[in-house]
Design a protein with these regions (language model features):
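Conserved cytosolic catalytic loops of P-type ATPases
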Residues: 4, 27-49, 53, 183-186, ...
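Conserved ATP-binding TGD loop and adjacent catalytic N/P-domain core of P-type ATPases
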Residues: 17, 38, 267, 412, ...
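Conserved catalytic phosphorylation-site environment of P-type ATPases
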Residues: 280, 376, 386-451, 534, ...
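Juxtamembrane helix-loop transition segments at the membrane interface in multi-pass membrane proteins
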Residues: 139-144, 205-220, 396-415, 632-639
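Flexible metal-binding regulatory segments at protein termini and peripheral loops
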Residues: 1-116, 216, 232, 268, ...
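Actuator/coupling domain of P-type ATPases
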Residues: 54, 58-76, 119, 123-224, ...
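Membrane-embedded alpha-helical bundles of multi-pass transporters
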Residues: 108-111, 143, 162, 404, ...
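Bilayer-spanning, highly hydrophobic alpha-helical transmembrane segments
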Residues: 90-98, 338-366, 378-386, 391-396, ...
Length: 639
């Protein structure tokens, strides 16, 4: 059984890695994949061995939460959390301005000791209210032998605060008596929390954009429907509709569920209505619907009205299945992400070790006079290290890429399919139903090219799609059960050089296998049961949405419409998405590789008197996460 479960409380990639590790350790769970940007866990489990309650208890123990209750809305929880985060960020800035005013002597309390004590109270208030979640999370992580970004924030702010408290009450006696100049660093502890909260606020806002495609699809389902009861038509909540109910859909209204037309009329046609299905199929022209035709939830009659019998409701509608498929794809992981997750698990311990080494190096080399510098350098290292940027690099790009594909009526089942599609350099395609549309009225007595045209029609834009693929370095192979004459004719019409005639289902599979042995990365496009063997064997399998359910079940990618130009679009989107992933990872790693030494004070080795302070470190850390998300969102703007 597969289920996507909302997760509450994740802050960085170490969080998602810890949750994933915990879930995978439970008996009865076949696999679990946790996505930071989608805030969800995709879990494949045996309900007889492990329950959702068991999972929730295990995740609660390490400081997070799963939303499994029916009446509990993850969206509402996230909205409340965002509002609270916003309030804390604003209040933290007020605390920060106050502490900065005291430390810069803009506010004078008569003597330094009083000023330090006031700053202590302000910083303590900021930590207890605005920064409370960091310390609670860090403590829960510590109890379970884990660590995440909250651990770094909690550790760095506590060190800065406690060292400042020590200096406030004992600085004169301990340091001044030894001729050492001392300071308090309450401003550092406050500014770290302030910048981290601000960064998280901006990050949440930016991440919200990565999920816009799913929200738009969810918005396609109406909240109410018109049910026909005898001579009465009344408006009812969509949740009350049952299979078999008779519904009425008027011009401009959304079809509430999947069903079968029992009556239709329009101004142009007495016994038919015209429905806009572009949001599902991508077809720009309205589809004519008569008695007995199928209608889909979320589509809109733009000419006429109809009555329909409900056949699939709730989670069984085509729209609900599409949404579920996209959510699962966005929650799945590309192979490169699994490497990043392993790095995230050791990232915080490694950074903590670097911070300790930094502290000891400054203290041993400089002695007690450099103890404040040693502490500040260690704090800066703890703060500037950012596992978030690495953790967000892959999933945010995948979420945007898969969401954009869905907007183009390209449904991608998992992240590996999107990643593998960019490598494709050979495409095997079925003919009938994939490249051509069979005509209903066929005259089998004719044998010339005119007869071929009468039997089936090349899909609009099929030739353009095949030529675009070949220009992009993809060799196209057409497989047909037709005789040589017909296969050659349609291959030429579609602009395809390689073709085979009189093929059986195993011949398609054999061609895919042969191309793979030649070192090619092969995609297979088909629409029928006779294509499933080849689809299953191909590196990337692509089904036509109007084909059989069997083909769509086997395929990793489904094209919902008949416009084959979505094939090269999918290839282009795959290449852009993977390029974006590597861009994000490159800058995330470069950020940590460059900034951690600068925070430690490495430039002093070259007689350059400069390093990144804890306050600036927190600002840079926040910016690094936001920049990764914003960079991924550029995919939405690419044509």
């Amino acid at each position: 059984m597969k289920r996507t479960i909302p997760v509450i409380g994740m802050a960085c990639s170490a969080c998602s890695a810890n949750i994933e590790k915990k879930l995978n350790s439970l008996n009865g769970i076949t696999s679990a994949s946790v996505s930071l940007p989608s805030r969800s866990a995709l879990v494949d489990f045996n309900p007889d061995e492990v329950s959702l309650t068991d999972m929730k208890a295990a995740i609660n123990a390490i400081g997070y939460d799963l939303v499994i209750e029916e009446g509990r809305s993850a969206v509402e929880i996230e909205k409340r959390a965002y509002t609270l985060l916003k309030r804390k960020a604003i209040l933290s800035w007020i605390f920060a301005i106050g502490v900065m005013a005291i430390s810069m002597h803009w506010i004078n309390f008569g003597n330094n000791n009083t000023s330090n004590q006031v700053a202590l109270l302000v910083a303590l208030g900021n930590m207890l209210y605005c920064g409370k979640q960091f310390y609670v999370s860090a403590w829960k992580q510590l109890k379970n032998g884990l660590a995440n970004m909250d651990t770094l924030v909690a550790l760095s702010t506590l060190i800065a605060f406690l060292f400042s408290v020590f200096n406030t009450f004992w600085g004169e006696a301990v340091w001044s008596s030894r001729g050492i100049v001392w300071h308090t660093y309450f401003d550092a502890s406050v500014m770290i929390i302030t910048f981290v909260l601000t960064g998280k606020l901006l990050e949440e806002k930016a991440k919200d954009g990565t999920a816009s495609s799913i929200r738009e699809m969810m918005g396609m389902t109406p909240k109410t429907a018109h049910i026909v009861d005898g001579d009465k038509v009344e408006e009812v909540p969509i949740s009350t509709i049952e299979v078999g109910d008779l519904l009425e859909v008027r011009t401009g209204e959304k079809v509430p569920v999947d069903g079968e037309v029992v009556w239709a009329e329009s101004f142009m046609t007495p016994n038919a209505a015209y429905i806009d299905e572009s949001m599902i199929t991508g077809e720009p022209n309205p589809a004519k619907k008569e008695k007995g035709d199928r209608v889909l939830a979320g589509t809109i009659p733009n000419q006429g009205k109809l009555r329909m019998r409900a056949r699939q409701i709730g989670k069984d509608t085509m729209l609900a299945q599409i949404i579920r498929m996209v959510q699962e794809a966005q929650g799945s992981k590309a192979p490169v992400q699994r490497i990043v997750d392993k790095a995230a698990l050791v990232f915080v311990p490694v950074v903590s070790t670097i911070a300790l080494v930094t502290f000891l190096a400054w203290w041993i080399i400089g002695g007690n006079a450099y103890l404040p510098q040693a502490i500040l350098s260690a704090i800066a290292v703890l703060v500037i290290a950012c596992p978030c940027a690495m953790g967000l690099a892959t999933p945010t790009a995948l979420m945007v890429g898969i969401g954009k594909a869905a907007e183009e009526q390209i449904l991608i089942k998992d992240a590996s399919a999107l990643e593998n599609l960019r490598k494709i350099n050979a495409l095997v395609t079925d003919k009938t139903g994939t490249l051509t549309i069979p005509n209903k009225n066929i005259d089998f007595t004719k044998s010339d090219n005119l007869a071929l045209e009468e039997r089936e029609t090349l899909k609009p834009n099929a030739r353009e799609a095949m030529e675009t693929l070949q220009k992009n370095g993809v060799e196209v192979y057409m497989m047909s059960g037709d005789k040589e004459e017909a296969a050659k004719y349609w291959a030429e019409k579609a602009g395809i050089k390689h073709y085979q005639s009189k093929v059986l289902p195993q011949d398609k599979e054999n061609l895919v296998r042969r191309l793979q042995t030649e070192g090619k990365h092969v995609a297979m496009v088909g629409d029928g049961i006779n294509d499933t063997q080849a689809l299953a064997l191909a590196d990337v399998s692509i089904a036509i949405g109007k084909g059989t359910d069997v083909a769509m079940d086997v395929a990793q990618i489904t094209l919902m419409g008949d416009d084959l130009r979505t094939l090269p679009e999918a290839l282009q989107l795959s290449r852009r998405t993977v390029r974006m992933i590597w861009e994000n990872l490159f800058w995330a790693f470069i950020y940590n590789i460059v900034c951690i030494p600068l925070a430690a004070g490495v430039l002093y080795l070259f007689d350059i008197d400069w390093q990144i302070t804890p306050s600036w470190a927190s600002a840079l850390m926040a910016f690094s996460s936001v920049s990764v998300v914003l960079n991924s969102l550029r995919l939405k703007l690419m044509k």
